[in-house]
Swiss-Prot record:
This is Scavenger receptor cysteine-rich domain-containing protein DMBT1. GO terms for cellular component: extracellular matrix; extracellular region; zymogen granule membrane. It comes from Oryctolagus cuniculus (Rabbit). It holds the Pfam family ZP-N. Interacts with LGALS3. Binds SFTPD and SPAR in a calcium-dependent manner. Keywords: Developmental protein, Differentiation, Disulfide bond, Glycoprotein, Protein transport, Repeat, Secreted, Signal, Transport.
């Protein structure tokens, strides 16, 4: 039986937390020295403001204390956050090789000057230390005892020949060139060796440190660490990295622990580790290594063998490992076989994919992998299976370097032998030589079929045209995009890809179509390196020939020469001219202006073609001007006078220099100075010039890749300037934009460009009317971050395939608009009619398509928990305002309701009788209104607003919450927000923080929250910037909360809550029994002259702890509910109390509003404290039931019923694990309703789970927690409910009811013994436009079995499991039989309706058959799941011939008589196998746990008379045993046998594993587990005088 296991990975996606702020310097230098230039003494390159770097107080210039020359004085760097990445930048900048370590704590002594840098955080790639993120110049919170240091690898190098006594470690790494007179000194003799192995390339890892050899601990030791060791010792590649002292325990010290290498380091000690001689392990964990050059040897290595030698080697793997492809048409395709221990074996296809095949093809020198077929595509191999679960990244040098299950370890058969087809398999025209090696080791450059070339045909020059490949043929445009074109342009040396036209833009090719479904990342070296369908495999015609236009196609003025190569391969190593410098000219300071580069002694400009924020980022970083603010083009800072030195610059933003970016070539351009590029960096000074009064509606800050002057943008035909039809001014005329692929990202760019706030919707289909002008843009695709609309990807100016009926529109929020949502007319703030504040007015939402996902967004936005239901039809009354939204469709993950897809603002086709509502979990009760005698007020509606407007406000509810701007996103700099809270007179206010994360400071001087006891003129209750858990309480009915942030360092901010309570509130305990004393009883609260009670919803010991402390009664012993001390008589004052346990008073805890509840006095809460137990004889009541025996879970098969937690309504036990399986008749659905749920608070402790089928293999419908109620419905006839409790705190538990109703009657599926029966409603077919005669089985070949049977209401198909095209799919856990019904449009030239595909499948799972039916997504989807039992026939037979079954019941036998049993699977599939796992005898057919006798258990024979017989087929099992002696004491006996169903001949499955002693779980896979009960068996009356009967013959 199969167990379907789904592993869900939840990625917590959140903003990275910044530890500091980059503060640029602002001085200006006309020249910047070339990186890498020689330096004098200990200084490196000179930067603006005279920045220099050195290492001081070390043994040489490449180790020491880090010092920076800043403003003319040397200062140090603090070690806060200092690590190997920071040290790497220092070493590179000083030309000192690689970083070896990054010591802190003033390892090289304390420096005398200032501390100039702190909190330095480098990625390791920066060109200069001050390019890294840091706290700011001279800003720190440390002393010189934390001065940072660095040790670089060149600190260990020598410039003079080594002495005769040179250690055994030889370093061949190259030494950088420095000015004469510098000598680099080696530190104290670090060496490396492998000890106690059979040769020098395998053994225990040992390091010579401070003159003694020591070992390395295996904590974290892996193949990457071993790789470094093998390379350092010149021993080839790492084969394995054994730990646990595989090569014996070493005698010396443990010198390294927690070693973590990337695999690229030059020395083992270059890797990250715990520190020298620092460890937490013993020698039993000594690490080892086996390298590929390890070879068996019978003599010890020579005494003079060096322990570390660096040289190149050709790996020869141990024990003669080889690789070949067998049974293919040539050596480059076939079944994968590995020579292991002298024999060829195969590789299993589990997890086998193109990455694995890539390694095989490279290893054999067969080019790149074309495909990775499994399922013994090249026949089943004869030998062993040597590898399984192979998982390669594609970069490994050998197949056995990949991760795998282990040699000769597998769970598969030869029917799963893996194969490979390499690219060179198709180019072989001559037979293979007899001496062809089976394993050839080549360099990693791919070898492709001979003679492959690439060209662009039928274009105006060699860099544009139809893509053709020799194999001469074309490429199909299926999936063809700009990434594919990029590879073509790079391969041909034609610059960057401009566009990737399809549909035979350059004419239809005459030859073959050689490639289809090409999918490139854009980084591949050749087009045929990209993923594709396979050579000459396609499903297209030449009308789909793909084309390319490259950037160099636009600069060609002469025809290409006849000898122009069709494929040009360039070297990827950049070469820069000498003397390059960079500056920004003609701006108000050095950090803004026109970009100029000093090239060949003259300053020149950069063209703005393709110029964007990434390019500007490189400029700003290179000049030390902070981050890029904008990248203006069109000579924003005036036209430059010199040459144009660079054009088509394209940076990723990470490059160290502007000229490191991809560009057209030096002095190569197609532009003029009117397109000079500019940059504005964050380090630029603010301008004081006011903006002109005539500011246009479109301001162009950024340049566009197509250089057209006068571009503008507007929205027309809307109610104001921030909504309407999108129009662009192009070449002097206004034109529209087509709505093809138009979405909210595109609209966001428009709204931001026009200064109109955020995008609310992106209406299409000319919602704002059709224009009469040109259509200037089509197929616009924005990421949402572009500076203007024309920066987005589009089809090209004036290129389109649409009409004005597709004009795109936009609705923006407006520059000063405020959006909010609220729930009105409900009994609490968390239920009611949904209303939205839009442009100053409240309006409703229509219920068309309104569902639980939409409600979820509303509940989360309002802080009301999760959505319980989404009622429509004006459940909460009809609204009176506008209807703002209709056809809302949310995924449930959106932050605000208006982010969901909808029809458009104020666009609807409904009335207020369809107003949508929401009920959230925090408001899912009917609240009893307060009595007229109280002084409580009518609750008001709480609203929440979007991030643009949630900075401050007036709060006037009894309880509520608010947050910092954009929470949980980062709050802005320079924020000042003020919230005023006011409650009725006579009430006080509590304020607490659920989350609080601000910039940290001991005095809260930067970002902080201030709480005032009234207005801001009142006394200060507190000033906080970190989460102390404190609750602030006012002395009046008013409170003011102020939040302020400074100009730097943002964080996620805070989420605050508040509640209110009467000033005269007091507390007591009432027990009615004096023996309990004053510290135990019913909790009562006084207010307004009356005592009231507290409801026990969510009441626990944390709440009780607050009560006990407030009354000075010691600690809480228990928190009984259910009116344990009797029911009170006054009002119910509080409900849903939720204390952390640290509050000073009960009313500081969070709860519902006072007198708001959904309970009665039978739920009054109580407390028992420790206070008086020392002076009373009364015992503490025991309310725990955790030690009592109980029944838990079960199988429910009736039409309806009820179940509950153990001991309900008493407290359930701890550590409960209960599962109820509810199965009803086929084609019915199950609904379960929870009528009472009282569990421990917090859904991670005690909870209920509802599954859509068996719980171990089905999707989770819902997790039900304390206080939640609701109904949940299955999609099939099976539903599981699982209850879990932890080891502490129990409560009353839950009660649930269930019932079943018929599912939809459109489709129906039954999985029977020999076939599946599918029925489709004729009415359903008619509704889709099909007749009953058009529906057929897809694989029907005329077989009468598959013909349809048409009744007046149904079309019925009988589909055998082994015919009519039924497909059988198997894996280790399931067997699935699949087919599908189809109805297609088969006549005419065009069609106006979709084809119909109804997929049907029967899948065997653990305890039942799963029946699924669905319709493919080219039509409406319909799903049905049905469960039924698997059929196995078990019978007694009269003899070992198994010819005649026993038909009588009871079956009367003699004592010790041979009994013969046969079991058989009743199913038409002949490829199933049956196995007897367990057989147990009992005198009671309903109790197999009390008095039992084991015949066989877990496949292990327990009865001496048990004997199995040969199986006539895998689906039949036969065995015998003798009647039992204990039958003398009982009138009858019953057998219960557990049978296991598996795949036949799957020797890894349970059916072929025999006796297995299980300790934790079942071993081996199977498809089905079947429990069978047989009997009764009764003894015959024994003949007189018979005393010792003998056993019968076998």
């Amino acid at each position: 039986m199969g167990i379907s296991t789904v592993l869900a990975l939840s990625l917590l996606w959140g903003p990275a937390l910044s530890q500091g702020q980059w503060i640029p310097y602002t001085t200006y230098h006309d020249s910047v020295s070339s990186p890498g230039a020689p330096v004098e003494t200990t200084t490196t390159e000179v930067f603006p403001s005279g920045l220099e770097l050195r290492l001081a107080n070390g043994g040489d210039r490449c180790q020491g204390r880090v010092e920076v020359l800043y403003q003319g004085s040397w200062g140090t760097v603090c070690d806060d956050g200092w690590d190997i990445n920071d040290a790497q930048v220092v070493c590179r900048q000083l030309g000192c090789g690689m970083a070896v370590s990054a010591p802190g704590s003033a390892r090289f002594g304390q420096g005398p000057g200032q501390i100039v840098l702190d909190d330095v955080s480098c990625s390791g790639q920066e060109p200069y230390l001050w390019s890294c993120h840091h706290r700011g110049w001279l800003s720190h919170n440390c002393g010189h005892q934390e001065d940072a240091g660095v040790i670089c690898s060149d600190a260990m190098a020598m410039t003079s020949p080594p002495p005769d006594t040179w250690p055994t470690t030889v370093i061949y790494e190259s030494t950088p060139h420095f000015p004469s007179g510098l000598e680099l000194v080696f530190p104290s003799g670090l060496e490396l060796r492998l000890a106690n192995g059979s040769d020098r390339c395998q053994g225990r890892v040992e390091v010579l440190y401070q003159g003694s050899w020591g070992t390395v601990c295996d904590d974290g030791w892996d193949i990457n660490d071993a790789q470094v060791v093998c390379r350092q010792l010149g021993c080839g590649m790492a084969v394995s990295a054994p730990g646990s002292a595989r090569f014996g325990q070493g005698p010396g010290q443990i010198v390294l622990d927690d070693v973590s290498c990337s695999g690229q380091e030059p020395y083992l000690w270059s890797c990250h580790h715990r520190g020298w001689l620092s460890h937490n392990c013993g020698h039993q964990e000594d690490a080892g290594v086996i390298c590929s050059d390890a070879v068996p040897t019978t003599t010890p290595p020579p005494d003079t063998w060096p322990t570390t030698v660096i040289y190149e080697s050709s790996p020869v793997f141990p024990s003669g490992l080889e690789l070949r492809l067998a049974n293919g048409s040539d050596r480059c395709q076939g079944r994968v076989e590995v020579l292991y221990q002298g024999s060829w074996g195969t590789v299993c296809d589990d997890g086998w994919d193109i990455n694995d095949a890539q390694v095989v093809c490279r290893q054999l020198g067969c080019g790149t992998a074309v495909s990775a077929p499994g399922s013994a595509r090249f026949g089943q191999g004869p030998g062993q299976i040597v590898l399984d679960d192979v998982s390669c990244s594609g970069q490994e040098p050998y197949l056995w370097s990949c991760h795998h299950r282990g040699w000769l370890s597998h769970n598969c058969g030869h029917q799963e032998d893996a194969g490979v087809i390499c690219s060179d398999a198709m180019a072989m025209t001559t037979p293979l030589p007899d001496t062809w090696p089976t394993t050839v080791i080549h360099e990693s450059t791919p070898v492709f079929p001979s003679g492959l070339e690439l060209q662009l045909a039928n274009g105006s020059d060699r860099c544009q045209g139809r893509v053709e490949v020799l194999y001469q043929g074309t490429v199909c445009d299926d999936g063809w995009d700009i990434n594919d074109a990029q590879v073509v342009c790079r391969q041909l040396g034609c610059g960057m890809a401009v566009s990737a036209p399809g549909s035979a833009r350059f004419g239809q090719g005459p030859g073959q179509i050689v490639l289809d479904d090409v999918s490139c990342s854009g980084q591949e070296p050749y087009l045929w390196s990209c993923h594709h369908r396979g050579w000459l495999s396609h499903n297209c015609g030449h009308q789909e020939d793909a084309g390319v236009i490259c950037s160099d196609a636009m600069a060609m003025t002469t025809p290409p020469p006849d000898t122009w190569p069709t494929t040009v391969i360039y070297e990827s190593t950049p070469h820069f001219p000498s003397g390059l410098e960079l500056r920004l000219a003609n701006g108000s300071d050095r950090c803004q202006g026109r970009v100029e580069v000093l090239y060949q002694g003259s300053w020149g400009t950069v063209c703005d073609d393709g110029w964007d924020i990434n390019d500007a980022q490189v400029v700003c970083r290179q000049l030390g001007c902070g981050t890029a603010v904008s990248a203006p083009g069109s000579a924003r800072f005036g036209q430059g006078p010199g040459q144009i030195v660079l054009d088509d610059v394209s940076c990723s933003g990470q490059e160290p220099y502007l000229w490191s970016c991809h560009h057209r070539g030096w002095l190569s351009h197609n532009c003029g100075h009117q397109e000079d590029a500019g940059v504005i960096c964050s380090g630029a000074m603010d301008t004081t010039t006011p903006l002109p009064d005539t500011w246009p509606t479109t301001v162009i800050y950024e340049s566009t890749p197509v250089h057209i002057s006068g571009l503008q943008l507007r929205l027309v035909n809307g109610s104001d300037r921030c909504e309407g039809r999108v129009e662009v001014l192009y070449q002097g005329s206004w034109g529209t934009v087509c709505d093809d692929s138009w979405d909210l990202n595109d609209a966001s760019v428009v709204c931001r460009q026009l200064g109109c706030g955020t995008a609310l919707s992106a209406p299409a289909s000319a919602q704002f009317g059709q224009s009469s002008g040109s259509i200037v843009l089509d197929d616009v695709s924005c990421s949402g971050s572009e500076p203007n609309l024309w920066s987005c990807s589009h089809r090209g100016w004036l290129s389109h395939n649409c009409g004005h009926h597709e004009d795109a529109g936009v609705v923006c929020s407006g520059p000063d608009s405020r959006l909010a949502v609220r729930l009105v007319n409900g009994s609490t703030r968390c239920q009611g009619r949904v209303e939205v504040l839009y442009r100053g007015s409240w309006g409703t939402v229509c219920d068309d398509s309104w569902d639980i996902n939409d409600a979820s967004v509303v509940c989360r936005q309002l802080g009301c928990g999760w959505a319980v239901s989404a009622p429509g039809s004006a459940r909460f009354g009809q609204g009176s305002g506008s209807i703002f939204l209709d056809e809302v469709s949310c995924s449930g993950q959106e932050p605000y309701l208006w982010n969901c897809s909808h029809r458009g603002w104020l666009s609807h086709n409904c009335g207020h009788y369809e107003d949508a509502g929401v009920i959230c979990s925090d408001g899912w009760t009917t609240v009893t209104p307060p009595a007229p005698t109280t002084d409580w007020w009518e609750p008001t509606v709480t609203t929440t607003v979007g991030p643009s407007s949630n900075c401050g406000g007036f709060l006037y509810n009894a309880t509520g919450s608010f947050s910092s701007p954009s929470y949980p996103g980062y709050y802005p700099n320079n924020a000042l927000c003020v919230w005023e809270i006011a409650v009725p007179s006579g009430y006080l206010i509590n304020l607490g923080f659920s989350q609080l994360r601000l910039e940290q400071h001991s005095y809260c001087n930067f970002d902080y929250v201030e709480i005032f006891d009234g207005s801001t003129d009142s006394s200060l209750l507190g000033k906080i910037c970190n989460d102390s858990g404190q609750i602030f309480t006012t002395s009046s009915n008013r409170m003011t909360v102020l939040f302020r942030s400074d100009i730097s360092v943002q964080n996620t901010g805070f989420l605050a809550w508040y509640n209110s309570f009467p000033r005269d509130a007091s507390l007591r305990l009432v027990s009615g029994n004096s023996s309990y004393g004053a510290c135990a009883g019913r909790v009562e609260i006084y207010h307004g002259g009356r005592w009231g009670t507290v409801c026990d919803d969510s009441w626990d010991t944390q709440d009780a702890q607050v009560v006990c402390r407030q009354l000075q009664c010691g600690d809480a012993v228990s928190a009984p509910g259910g009116a344990y001390f009797g029911s009170g008589s006054g009002p119910i004052t509080l409900d849903d109390v939720n204390c952390s346990g640290t509050e000073a008073t009960l009313w500081q805890c969070r709860s519902q509003s006072w007198f708001s509840h959904n309970c009665g006095h039978h739920e009054d809460a109580s407390v028992i404290c420790t206070g008086n137990y020392g002076t009373t004889t009364a015992s503490v009541p025991n309310i725990s039931t955790s030690n009592a025996s109980y029944s838990c879970g079960g199988f429910l098969s009736q039409h309806s019923g009820r179940f509950s937690s153990p001991f309900y309504p008493g407290n359930y036990p701890n550590n409960a694990r209960c599962v109820w399986d509810i199965e009803v008749q086929n084609n019915y659905q199950v609904t379960v309703t929870f009528t009472d749920v009282q569990l421990e608070g917090g859904c991670q402790y005690d909870y209920i789970e509802v599954f859509d089928g068996p719980y171990h293999s089905s999707p989770l419908i819902a997790r039900v927690c304390d206080g939640a109620r609701g109904s949940f419905t299955s999609s099939s006839n099976f539903l599981s409910v699982r209850f879990v409790s932890d080891g502490s705190i129990t409560r009353r538990g839950f009660q649930a009811e269930f019932y079943s109703l018929p599912s939809n009657d459109s489709t129906n599926l039954l999985c029977l013994m020999n076939h599946m029966q599918a029925s489709v409603s004729r009415a359903y077919l008619q509704s889709l436009g099909f007749s009953a005669w058009e529906l057929v089985v897809s694989g029907w070949n005329g077989n009468y079995q598959c013909q349809r049977q048409i009744t007046p209401s149904q079309v019925i198909f009988t589909i055998p499991y082994s015919g009519c095209g039924t497909i059988k799919q198997v894996d280790n856990e399931t067997i699935t039989y699949s087919n599908f019904l189809k109805a297609a449009v088969s006549s005419g030239v065009i069609k106006r309706k979709k084809d119909l595909h109804i997929h049907v499948s029967c899948r065997m799972l653990q305890d039942s058959w799963v029946h699924t039916m669905y319709i493919a997504n080219d039509t409406i989807e319909v799903s049905e799941v049905q469960y039924s039992n698997f059929n196995v026939n078990v019978s007694f037979y009269t003899s070992s011939s198994f010819s005649y079954p026993v038909t009588s019941s009871p079956y009367y036998v003699d004592l010790d008589q041979n009994l013969y049993l046969q079991a058989e699977i009743l199913h038409s599939d002949a490829s199933l196998a049956l196995f007897v796992d367990t057989c147990v005898a009992s005198p009671n057919p309903n109790d197999f746990t009390s008095v039992t006798y084991d015949l066989i258990r877990s496949g292990c024979v327990r009865d001496e008379t048990y004997r199995s017989y040969a199986q006539p087929s895998p689906r039949v099992v036969r065995f015998r045993f003798n009647s039992f002696h204990f039958l003398n004491r009982f009138p009858a006996v019953y057998l219960r046998c557990k049978m296991v169903v598996c795949r036949a001949y799957d020797y890894s499955s349970r059916c072929y594993r025999g006796c297995v002693v299980r300790s934790k779980r079942d071993v081996g896979s199977y498809q089905e587990r079947v429990d069978v009960v047989l009997g009764p068996i009764q003894l015959l009356d024994p003949p007189a005088g018979k005393k010792s009967p003998g056993k019968g013959s076998p």
